[in-house]
């Protein structure tokens, strides 16, 4: 019902009081009907996005086993909030915030818009070293290694 997907709901038009219940319902129905190996939950914005922070519901109500965090290293401000100087927090602090919710960041996927190949690989290497978390360039290198991480996470749980 949602552009070809059987499970989910329109997050942006759901009153916040009902978001957790809608998330839980979508996951339970999907699990009962399909019994999938994975349920991938596409996140929304960021935990500290000034236009509407969200994500806590996804982390807690969905009881996620791991987070693949999307990061845009060249972005300085939240999109659309440059005029008020809404700086993006550091990646390390975002990882720490997710961990404060009791969830683990299992990988980081980089948005490589406006980056040279040298910059892409430089960010990949430095972030992986700093945070000791696997970093991926999904558009440039694919996601096979990431899929292996997710399979291991599934098998360990």
Locate each region found by the language model.
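Flexible phosphate-sensing "switch/lid" loops adjacent to ATP/NTP-binding sites
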Residues: 1-157
């Amino acid at each position: 019902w949602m552009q070809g997907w059987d499970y989910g709901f329109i997050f942006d038009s759901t009153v916040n009081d009902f978001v957790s219940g809608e998330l839980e319902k979508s996951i339970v129905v999907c699990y009962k009907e399909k019994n999938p190996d994975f349920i991938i939950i596409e996140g929304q914005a960021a935990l500290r996005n000034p236009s509407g922070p969200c994500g806590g519901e996804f982390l807690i109500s969905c009881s996620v086993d791991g987070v693949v965090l999307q990061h845009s290293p060249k972005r300085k401000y939240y999109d659309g909030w440059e005029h008020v100087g809404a700086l993006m927090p550091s990646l390390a602090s975002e990882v720490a915030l997710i961990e404060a919710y009791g969830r683990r960041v299992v990988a980081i996927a980089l948005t490589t818009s406006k980056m040279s190949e040298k910059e892409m690989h430089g960010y990949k290497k430095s972030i992986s070293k700093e945070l000791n978390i696997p970093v991926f360039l999904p558009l440039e290198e694919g996601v096979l290694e990431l899929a292996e991480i997710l399979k291991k996470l599934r098998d360990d749980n």
